Amino acid sequence: MELLQVTILFLLPSICSSNSTGVLEAANNSLVVTTIKTSITTPNTESLQKNVITPTTGTTPKGKITNELLKMSLMSAVTLTSKDEGLKVTTTDVRKNESIVSNVTVTIVTLPNAVSTLQSSKPKTETQSSIKTTEIPGSILQPDASPSETGTLSSIPVTIPENTSQSQVIGTEGGKNASTSATSRSYSSIILPVVIALIVITLSVFVLVGLYRMCWKADPGTPENGNDQPQSDKESVKLLTVKTISHESGEHSAQGKTKN
C-alpha cells in the first residue's frame, strides 16, 4: 500500500500538467483500499477423567493455524479431551463455507521427580533396576476442507511409569559411580605406597652393596689366601725365631767352654 501511495504521488504532477480531468477521476476511482481482518478465538478446554496421578501434564496444543479466508472473519474452537480410551483433539468452526488448513501438535511433558500411584488391587513392587511403562494410544482428529467428511486419525503413544521414577534410577546410577570411584581411590591409595617402598628398599640395598665393596677393596690388610695374620706379623715372628735360635746357640757354646 505504501508503494502505491508513493507511485501515485510521483504521478500526480504529470497528471496535473496534462490537464486531463477524466484521467484524474479514473485514477482516483482505481485506488481502492481493501483491508481484511481475521479474528480467531481458540478457547482451550481440558478435561482429565482418570483416577491416576500421573507425571504427565497436558499442555495446550502448539502449532501454526493458517486460514485462507477472503470474505469474512472466522470463529474456531479447539477442545482437548483426555479419557481412558485415548486422546482426541477436535477443531470446530462456525462457518462451513470456508476451507481450513490447520496444523496442531500436542506435546506432553513428563516430570522426572514425580511418581505415579495407580489405584489397583495388584501389590506394588519398587525395583531400582527396571521401569515398567504403560502405553495409552491417542488420536488426533483433523477436519478436511469439507466439514461433512471425517478427518484422519494418527496415534500418539503416551508412556506413564508405574512403579519406579526416573530420579530413583538416576540416583542408583550415581551411587554406583560413586562406589566405583571410591574403590578405585582406595586401591590407588594402597598400591602407590607399596610401590614407593619397594623402590626405596631396592635402591638402599644397591647403595649398601656398593659401599661394602668399596670398603673391602680399600682395606690393604685383608689377606687374599685365607690367612688371618698380616705379612708384617709374619716378618716379626721370623725375626723372633732367629733371635731365639741365636741366643740358644750362644748358651750352648758357653756351656761347652765351661765344661772344658
From Swiss-Prot:
Residues 119-182 are annotated as: Disordered. Residues 211-260 are cytoplasmic. GO terms for cellular component: membrane. It is a single-pass membrane protein. Its main location: membrane. Highly O-glycosylated. Sialic acid-rich glycoprotein. The modification Phosphoserine is found at S236. This is Endomucin. It comes from Pongo abelii. The lineage of its organism: Eukaryota, Metazoa, Chordata, Craniata, Vertebrata. The gene is EMCN.
